[in-house]
């Protein structure tokens, strides 16, 4: 028997797979996004970009940008009564209107 992998991407095949339509789109514009502290964002992981990728558990969560951290942004995500901080590149974030 082969030992099961316990790496950071294990168990994420469906979350980190793009459809044929998504593979055609360029992500260059998403690299150029800028956020201000207090902006609400959704974590939408771009599987083709590994730099600044948050852990796949946070795929689909929403949070508030705390501020920049290097080339990435620190995002406060509230899960039940806990506040977790995710550091993600702008290509993995989408601004929420409102």
Curated annotation (Swiss-Prot):
One GO term of the biological process aspect: translation
UniProt entry tagged with the keyword Cytoplasm: no
Domain of life: Archaea
MF terms (GO), sorted A to Z: structural constituent of ribosome
Keyword Glycoprotein: no
Region (Disordered) location: 1-24
GO cellular component terms, A-Z: ribonucleoprotein complex; ribosome
Residues passing through the membrane, by range: none
Keywords, in A-Z order: Ribonucleoprotein, Ribosomal protein
Pfam families: Ribosomal_L21e
Protein family: Belongs to the eukaryotic ribosomal protein eL21 family.
Protein name (Swiss-Prot/TrEMBL): Large ribosomal subunit protein eL21
């Amino acid at each position: 028997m082969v030992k099961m992998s316990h790496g950071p991407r294990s168990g994420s095949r469906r979350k980190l797979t793009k459809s044929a339509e998504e593979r055609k789109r360029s992500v260059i514009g998403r690299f150029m996004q800028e956020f201000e502290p207090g902006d609400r964002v959704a974590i939408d992981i771009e599987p083709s970009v590994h730099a600044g990728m948050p852990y796949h558990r946070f795929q689909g969560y929403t949070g508030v940008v705390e501020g920049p951290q290097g080339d990435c942004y620190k995002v406060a995500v509230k899960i039940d009564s806990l506040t977790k901080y995710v550091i993600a590149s702008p290509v993995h974030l989408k601004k929420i209107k409102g």
